[in-house]
Amino acid sequence: MPMLLPHPHQHFLKGLLRAPFRCYHFIFHSSTHLGSGIPCAQPFNSLGLHCTKWMLLSDGLKRKLCVQTTLKDHTEGLSDKEQRFVDKLYTGLIQGQRACLAEAITLVESTHSRKKELAQVLLQKVLLYHREQEQSNKGKPLAFRVGLSGPPGAGKSTFIEYFGKMLTERGHKLSVLAVDPSSCTSGGSLLGDKTRMTELSRDMNAYIRPSPTRGTLGGVTRTTNEAILLCEGAGYDIILIETVGVGQSEFAVADMVDMFVLLLPPAGGDELQGIKRGIIEMADLVAVTKSDGDLIVPARRIQAEYVSALKLLRKRSQVWKPKVIRISARSGEGISEMWDKMKDFQDLMLASGELTAKRRKQQKVWMWNLIQESVLEHFRTHPTVREQIPLLEQKVLIGALSPGLAADFLLKAFKSRD
């Protein structure tokens, strides 16, 4: 029995015990109390509505709290100028305008506090549009997300240019999010990936966006998830994320994509020491690159080695076994076959429901990554912590204080804030 009440009185709630109904479902207006003298378990001021269930049980009235998904208007607090700016970006983006997409990604990459707020408003609008489009597509994903990783010199950019041209010629719209490493000293980045894809960068059905890592580990940027969502909102049906190829720890992209592809050069021994169990376990497809000319024989040997190695690894999917193929971006050998295997992977994962479950899990990982980032930002900007950091750093440098004890002092100062 649904009822909408502003503030139910305590006597009204007690009177429900004498009612013949087994269950009432009430929705209350935003407040820190559910009614007179009935405080919430926590204030839900950020929510537009409260949702509370009162179950009439034999042992009396039992309250169950649950959070409604209806949130307050995300545009609350925006000036007219800011609202027009967000609306302009949103309208242009869903119409597929590349300039608006580029500006939107720049907005979400900004570290300015107000721009970050505007970015969240824009992302919420795009997310709602994205959900509507998926529903009209019978619940199927709008885009196929593919992560590419591999050691330096594996030929990732060369492969993407050949592969991307093939896809656009077949009628697909391709977005490439190329991540470039930032300098540890200056913080700068060359962003040279786009210059290595000259043909693809001129293709009107392809969009290449190089972004700096700015120190983010995992081979991706801080806002890669947001950029993926914006590209899908702009109508791109294949999203390629080329990661920083710097070793076995750089596979955070696997938590953002549908399929993780590992590109390996035809080399062995010390040259592949960084490509070990960790990243191999995450790969859905392994491609041995540069399989042409004098490198065909070593490429075949590496392929056989990894076919054997993959048999020993734990099975990650009930419907898909990782494949190892040889490709050449120079001759085109194996590229079409590789795309066929990628489509097979997508079809099998969709049919089994594993892809849907994987994306839901990725949303949870995305949320916790944002929480960690936000908590760290609040920690660094806390007045007491900011004041104590230089003093404690100096004591750690001269050996008067252990790093662990200094960290404990800062955490206690942060937790004891008013």
From Swiss-Prot:
Classification via SUPFAM superfamilies:
P-loop containing nucleoside triphosphate hydrolases (SSF52540)
The activity regulation comment is: GTPase activity is stimulated by MMUT.
Provide the protein's localization.
Mitochondrion; Cytoplasm
Explain what the record says happens when changing residue 145 to Q.
Answer: In MACA; highly decreases protein levels; decreases protein stability
Query: What does the annotation give as the result of altering residue 292 to A?
Result: Abolishes binding to GTP and GTPase activity
Task: Please tell me in which tissues this protein is expressed.
Answer: Widely expressed. Highest expression is observed in liver and skeletal muscle.
Q: Main subcellular localization, coarse class?
A: mitochondrion
Which keywords has UniProt assigned to this entry? Chaperone, Cytoplasm, Disease variant, GTP-binding, Hydrolase, Mitochondrion, Nucleotide-binding, Transit peptide
Cite the InterPro entries for this sequence. Answer: GTPase_ArgK, P-loop_NTPase
Q: Which Pfam families match?
A: MeaB (PF03308)
Please name the CDD domains in this protein's record.
MMAA-like
Q: What is its EC number?
A: 3.6.-.-
State the Gene Ontology BP annotations: cobalamin metabolic process
Q: Enumerate the catalysed reactions.
A: GTP + H2O = GDP + phosphate + H(+)
Q: Look up the transit peptide and give its residue range.
A: 1-65
Subunit details: Homodimer. Interacts with MMUT (the apoenzyme form); the interaction is GTP dependent.
Can you say what this protein is called?
A: Methylmalonic aciduria type A protein, mitochondrial
Name the source organism: Homo sapiens (Human)
| Annotated gene | MMAA
